[in-house]
């Protein structure tokens, strides 16, 4: 029952649209809400507890005081509510986790020679902003791609000072040096326009333009410019290929879905422009326990698009959103054109939303694993493993194994080590497969296990190989586990504890047991095993890609007539890598000993 002061405040509430603030006994704002009719909305909280969710009951029990602000419309109330939630971050509101200062990309169009850089604040200063991005890693990656493609200046001066010679950025092909007149103002402005088109998702337009410029440069025998355009074209094609979606999509739209566990929801947003996925971001929402799916999506949409610089004409959501009409009006006003919000419940939109939702679930799982040590103690996870697997002691040392290859080529194996639940990267080991031909993962696992345990008693075993694990984890199911168990038995290690973790259903296989074990999705023990398994996969894949890149680099040079082993070594020594050779100018290639102008031209054309 509300206190007398609170009862009087409720009784005096107006029947206008507005925002209400609920405070506890300490005067802290614990909830902010909006309403078309303030009196009706606030009174709906003070009903018998049986008609409220447990979360709302807890909120009502803490309300000691009410404040309200009248607005001219429900749309104005929505904007005010957003600002108050962002400022006060009330405990009972659904809110973006760590939403203070999401990063943006800024293009300084107010400067003579515009720059592109990362910022955490927006100002009405004539600049163009893109974002927000969920984290600095994704925005840095985007900036790196832009830098490699368009080579804009990155010096901090608003006006680059005149220089007699270019700086290092020019020498390493990261800037076109406007400060020394290496590029005209019109060409530089054209370059920035291409970067904007790229960020808007109009890569096809940029591609057509670059192909035309490459052909024009080639026709006038300007091979250096033609090679630059060719490299840009190849990079953009690679980006476009990575933007294809399994679902058929058209036009411009954002697709939003989430996965929830308790009070935390992970929201995934796919940004689709011209039928291609140009980016995706994940955001954490707090305070979502017992909230309806439509309310969660509505709260996210309000908070995300409040700070977003790009609003598409269509937004597809996992469930029908609450307050759809008022949201559409507000978003249409912000965009300057009509915005439609629709739920992807059937057909092509459902296909798309299913993909987004699967990514949201994966992101939530990774967040759980990442936060394992802070949310539950590793001691509890190890103790649960001991019980679930029937071990005599908690597994103090866990070793994880995985294989990575493509149709048997560049095959490698990995071994990662976790002690007391924490990775020990100094003990990680990698294996290049030597005895197995073709795609035979079982035999590859046997080779890795034989090489690892064959060194246990050798003097040169080292600390990592000299110790036996408390538990071995194999990435795979019954077949992989049987291969490893057979190898261990041959090595006289019949008592070695070993399990397989199959990815599809996260089932745990044990030797001599026909049926797998299934632990709860939020089990600390399962989360620890997933972390070991995923780390083994990451480590193996990284080594595999490294070998593939090395083999790919040498074959690229081998295909150029006149470049034999000695010239290849000299080129690599001079420029550091094939990427460095590819970026080198015609003049610099011609200066390398043994490389005449004709051969330098062949290298530029064929590499």
From Swiss-Prot:
Q: Which Cys pairs does UniProt list as disulfide-bonded?
A: none
Claim: Cytoplasm is one of the keywords in the record: yes
Localization in the cell: Cytoplasm
- Identify the residues that the record assigns to the UVR domain, covering every copy: 204-239
Q: Name one GO cellular component term.
A: excinuclease repair complex
Drop me one GO molecular function for this one. Answer: DNA binding
GO BP terms in the entry:
nucleotide-excision repair; SOS response
User: What positions does the domain GIY-YIG occupy?
Assistant: 15-94
**Keywords from the UniProt entry:** Cytoplasm, DNA damage, DNA excision, DNA repair, Excision nuclease, SOS response
- Classification via PROSITE patterns: GIY_YIG (PS50164), UVR (PS50151), UVRC (PS50165)
Name the protein family.
Belongs to the UvrC family.
What does this protein's UniProt record list under function? The UvrABC repair system catalyzes the recognition and processing of DNA lesions. UvrC both incises the 5' and 3' sides of the lesion. The N-terminal half is responsible for the 3' incision and the C-terminal half is responsible for the 5' incision.
Q: How does it assemble?
A: Interacts with UvrB in an incision complex.
Name this protein carries in UniProt: UvrABC system protein C
Query: Encoded by which gene?
Result: uvrC
């Amino acid at each position: 029952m509300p206190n007398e002061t609170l009862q009087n405040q409720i009784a005096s509430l107006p029947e206008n649209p507005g925002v209400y603030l609920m405070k506890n006994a300490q005067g802290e704002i614990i909830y902010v809400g909006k309403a078309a009719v303030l009196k009706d909305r606030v009174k709906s909280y003070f009903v018998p507890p049986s008609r409220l969710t447990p979360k709302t009951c807890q909120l009502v029990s803490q309300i000691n005081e009410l404040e309200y602000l009248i607005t001219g419309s429900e749309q104005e109330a929505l904007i005010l509510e957003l600002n108050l939630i962002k400022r006060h971050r009330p405990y009972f509101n659904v809110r973006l986790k760590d939403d203070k200062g999401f990063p943006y990309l800024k293009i300084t169009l107010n400067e003579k020679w515009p720059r592109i850089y990362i910022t955490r604040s927006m100002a009405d200063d004539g600049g163009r902003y893109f974002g927000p991005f969920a984290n600095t890693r994704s925005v840095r990656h985007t900036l790196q791609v832009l830098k490699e493609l368009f080579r804009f200046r990155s010096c901090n001066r608003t006006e680059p000072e005149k220089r007699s010679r270019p700086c290092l950025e020019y020498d390493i092909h990261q800037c076109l040096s406007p400060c020394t007149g290496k590029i005209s103002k019109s060409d530089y402005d054209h370059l920035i326009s291409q970067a904007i088109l790229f960020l808007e998702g109009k890569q096809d337009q940029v591609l057509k333009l670059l192909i035309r410029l490459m052909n024009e440069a080639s026709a006038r025998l300007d091979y250096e410019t033609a090679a630059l355009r060719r490299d840009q074209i190849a990079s953009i094609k690679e980006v476009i290929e990575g933007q294809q979606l399994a679902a058929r999509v058209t036009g411009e739209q954002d697709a939003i879905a989430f996965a929830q566990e308790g009070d935390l929801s992970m929201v995934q947003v796919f940004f689709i422009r011209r039928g291609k996925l140009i980016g995706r971001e994940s955001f954490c929402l707090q305070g979502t326990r017992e909230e309806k799916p439509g309310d969660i999506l509505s709260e996210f949409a309000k908070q995300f698009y409040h700070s977003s610089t790009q609003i598409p004409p269509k937004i597809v959501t996992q469930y029908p959103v609450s307050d759809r009409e008022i949201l559409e009006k507000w978003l249409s006003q912000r965009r300057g054109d009509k915005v439609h919000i629709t739920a992807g419940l059937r057909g092509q939109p459902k296909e798309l939303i299913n993909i987004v939702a699967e990514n949201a679930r994966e992101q939530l799982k990774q967040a759980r694993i990442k936060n394992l040590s802070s949310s539950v103690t590793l001691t509890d996870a190890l103790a649960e493993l001991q019980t679930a697997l029937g071990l005599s002691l908690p597994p103090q040392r866990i070793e994880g194994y995985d294989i990575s290859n493509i149709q048997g080529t560049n095959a490698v194996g990995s071994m990662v080590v976790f002690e007391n639940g924490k990775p020990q990267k100094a003990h990680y080991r990698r294996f290049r497969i030597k005895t197995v031909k073709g795609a035979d993962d079982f035999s590859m696992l046997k080779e890795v296990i034989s090489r690892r345990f064959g060194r246990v008693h050798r003097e040169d075993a080292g600390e990592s190989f000299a110790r036996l694990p408390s538990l071995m984890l194999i990435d795979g199911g019954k077949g992989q586990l049987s291969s490893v168990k057979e190898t261990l038995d041959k090595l006289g290690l019949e008592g070695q504890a070993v399990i397989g973790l199959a990815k599809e259903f996260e089932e745990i296989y044990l030797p001599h047991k026909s049926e797998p074990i299934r632990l709860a999705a939020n089990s600390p023990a399962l989360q620890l095993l997933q972390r070991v398994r995923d780390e083994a996969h990451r480590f193996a894949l990284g080594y595999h890609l490294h070998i593939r890149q090395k083999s790919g680099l040498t074959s690229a040079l081998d295909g150029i007539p006149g470049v034999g082993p000695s010239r290849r070594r000299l080129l690599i020594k001079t420029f550091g890598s094939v990427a460095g050779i590819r970026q080198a100018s015609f003049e610099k290639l011609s200066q390398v000993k043994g490389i005449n102008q004709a051969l330098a031209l062949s290298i530029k054309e064929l590499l």
